[in-house]
């Protein structure tokens, strides 16, 4: 997060001037895409995030303005950049310190029929190493929580990371076990790396897809080994959790991945 002093425009060579210039360039790209998408004849049939936002209306039937759409897209892309990269760092750290899981993932990517195990690895990573450990919410009506009376309007911060470490929900919760997600038995409010409810993270689907795709490409293509004996400790950086020293990986050689055979399209 940039300091207000750095965001301010102090002249042509200042960081603030570069920030404003790049922000305007990003705005132009996003607004052009919004305008182009509004003209698409098949908008009603599209299921991507932007199309869903374009069709969304509030309680009074009003759609989102271009400025509101731009802000949502910028939030999704900008806020998701660091968080997704951090989630991937956690994934590599956990996989490299669990060689049997790494070997199974590589085999499933190369020979499996679907992405079930790959998706389970991503979900288990974000359960054991969530990038965001709390989500602010404002109570719309009074609540009693553990004997405490909380009036409407109070801000609460559910400890998402603690929920995901409950032994009654996740047996052997401190262990990295992706197979626990293969049966998709996790309760809706027991897996919360993106929050929950109507204010769940807008970029959740994009982040999951990005993490899966990076692992799909990187794992079969390289022989990877951990540099340290144990996974890196987790620390709080600004509002996100991250590996304390970063995740260092040793690449011993390039592999020739055995690609999963393509399924003919009829």
Map each language-model feature to its residues.
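Conserved cytochrome P450 K-helix/beta-meander segment immediately N-terminal to the heme-binding cysteine loop
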Residues: 142, 158-185
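Cytochrome P450 proximal C-terminal region
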Residues: 110-112, 200, 205-266
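Cytochrome P450 catalytic-core helices
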Residues: 81-108, 204-222
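Cytochrome P450 catalytic core segment centered on helix I
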Residues: 1-59, 265
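Conserved cytochrome P450 K-helix E-x-x-R motif and the immediately C-terminal K′/meander segment
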Residues: 28, 112-146, 167
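Proline-centered turn/helix-capping motifs that create local helix->coil transitions or kinks
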Residues: 1-3, 33-46, 62, 129-134, ...
């Amino acid at each position: 997060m940039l300091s207000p002093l750095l965001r301010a425009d102090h002249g042509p060579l200042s960081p603030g001037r570069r920030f404003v210039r790049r922000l305007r360039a990003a705005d132009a790209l996003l607004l052009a895409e919004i305008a182009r998408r509004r003209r698409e004849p098949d908008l009603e049939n599209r299921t991507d995030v932007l199309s869903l936002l374009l069709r969304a209306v509030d309680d009074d039937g009003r759609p989102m303005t271009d400025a509101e759409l731009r802000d949502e897209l910028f939030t999704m892309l900008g806020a998701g950049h660091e968080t997704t990269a951090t989630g991937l760092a956690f994934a590599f750290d956990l996989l490299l310190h669990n060689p049997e899981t790494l070997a199974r993932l590589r085999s499933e990517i190369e020979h499996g029929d679907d992405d079930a195990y790959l998706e389970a690895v991503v979900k288990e990573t974000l359960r054991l190493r969530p990038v965001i450990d709390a989500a602010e919410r404002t109570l719309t009506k009074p609540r009693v929580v553990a004997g405490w009376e909380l009036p409407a309007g109070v801000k609460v911060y559910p400890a998402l990371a603690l929920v995901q470490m409950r032994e009654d929900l996740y047996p052997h919760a401190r262990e990295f076990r992706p197979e626990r997600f293969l049966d998709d038995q996790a309760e809706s409010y027991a897996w919360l790396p993106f929050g929950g409810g109507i204010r769940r993270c807008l970029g959740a689907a994009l982040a999951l897809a990005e993490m899966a795709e990076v692992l799909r490409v990187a794992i079969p293509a390289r022989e990877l080994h951990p540099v340290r004996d144990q996974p890196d400790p987790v620390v709080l950086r600004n509002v996100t959790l991250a590996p304390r020293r970063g995740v260092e990986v040793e690449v011993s050689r390039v592999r020739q991945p055995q690609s999963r055979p393509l399924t003919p399209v009829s």
